[in-house]
Amino acid sequence: MNKNIVIKSMAALAILTSVTGINAAVVEETQQIANAEKNVTQVKDTNIFPYNGVVSFKDATGFVIGKNTIITNKHVSKDYKVGDRITAHPNGDKGNGGIYKIKSISDYPGDEDISVMNIEEQAVERGPKGFNFNENVQAFNFAKDAKVDDKIKVIGYPLPAQNSFKQFESTGTIKRIKDNILNFDAYIEPGNSGSPVLNSNNEVIGVVYGGIGKIGSEYNGAVYFTPQIKDFIQKHIEQ
């Protein structure tokens, strides 16, 4: 049977059961089928690498690149200022908690949508007393390079409020690289801004800045980490 017909039939059944209350499990199964069609899976344990390197903001994503240092987008960091408290920690079914205070925000001087945040090492709210950021996350390493058709994964927090701030992983391939821009076909949604684009070795290639939320789209975009961008980031990693 055609897979699209199955998905449409399941979706129709899900609508019916949501009204009648017959079987809520059908709704969950339908969502799982839809996610499988997009090559998207929910991360169950965010305490293991590479998932413990991807942190949740209130409506976006970031990832750890060094001691007390997080990469995200300018359009994410513009909503914050030094001294603000953020839920910069991996989240999910086994999230480790902790709220941290921002020490500095450094935007990339070019047009590229990259921002580096440095945070206080000790949690100021939630989590055990004296909760240490670096003991509960793992920083990513830079990939040496990347090329078209390389397999990639994107990890982040799509539709965070709707998905209860759970972490998801999507997979795909690189479709093109031009200057500082990388296009890929892994499925992304609002909330994936600031997600890392990783190669098969879980090394970071770039940071997601936008997409059109369409299966198979080749126009989802990330800032590609060129030597110049890597150098900027490296200079802002806390020593």
Curated annotation (Swiss-Prot):
Instruction: Summarize the record's induction comment.
Output: Positively regulated by agr (accessory gene regulator).
Domain of life assignment: Bacteria
Q: EC number(s) of the enzyme? A: 3.4.21.-
Which residues are the signal sequence here?
Answer: 1-36
Extract the Pfam families matched here.
Trypsin
Quote the subcellular location field of this record. Answer: Secreted
Primary location recorded for the protein, binned into one broad class: secreted
- The active site is formed by 75 (charge relay system), 113 (charge relay system), 193 (charge relay system)
* Single GO BP term: proteolysis
Q: Which GO terms describe its molecular function?
A: serine-type endopeptidase activity
Q: Which UniProt keywords apply?
A: Hydrolase, Protease, Secreted, Serine protease, Signal
Gene Ontology CC entries for this record: extracellular region
Q: Report the sequence similarity comment from the record.
A: Belongs to the peptidase S1B family.
Query: What is the protein name for this chain?
Result: Serine protease SplC
User: What organism does the record attribute this protein to?
Assistant: Staphylococcus aureus (strain NCTC 8325 / PS 47)
Highest classification ranks of the organism: Bacteria, Bacillati, Bacillota, Bacilli, Bacillales
